[in-house]
Curated annotation (Swiss-Prot):
This is NADH-ubiquinone oxidoreductase chain 4L. One of its GO terms (molecular function) is NADH dehydrogenase (ubiquinone) activity. It is found in: Mitochondrion inner membrane. The keyword Protease does not apply. It catalyses: a ubiquinone + NADH + 5 H(+)(in) = a ubiquinol + NAD(+) + 4 H(+)(out). Keywords: Electron transport, Membrane, Mitochondrion, Mitochondrion inner membrane, NAD, Respiratory chain, Translocase, Transmembrane, Transmembrane helix, Transport, Ubiquinone. It is a multi-pass membrane protein. The chain crosses the membrane at residues 1-21, 29-49, 61-81. The lineage of its organism: Eukaryota, Metazoa, Chordata, Craniata, Vertebrata. The gene is MT-ND4L. Pfam families: Oxidored_q2 (PF00420). GO terms for cellular component: mitochondrial inner membrane; respiratory chain complex I. Core subunit of respiratory chain NADH dehydrogenase (Complex I) which is composed of 45 different subunits. It is an enzyme of class 7 (translocase).
Amino acid sequence: MSLVYMNIMMAFTVSLTGLLMYRSHLMSSLLCLEGMMLSLFILATLMILNSHFTLASMMPIILLVFAACEAALGLSLLVMVSNTYGTDYVQNLNLLQC
């Protein structure tokens, strides 16, 4: 396995660890999710380019579309929570209080 793949997998692992450890603020969770999606996009693109599998060439673009939708929904949720509660704590996202 080359160093590029190892670095991308390590970036995904660091983002996943950050998501699991620093769950107090919504903004830090969104940044970790974006880091995970970016590393998945780069890994999928490199694997498709190296394997010359042209049928799956749309998969990274579809992944990027889902990442953009996730970012838009996350930022709208962040704006709504910060306007309602004044903070961006994840503990405010209890469904029983809404």
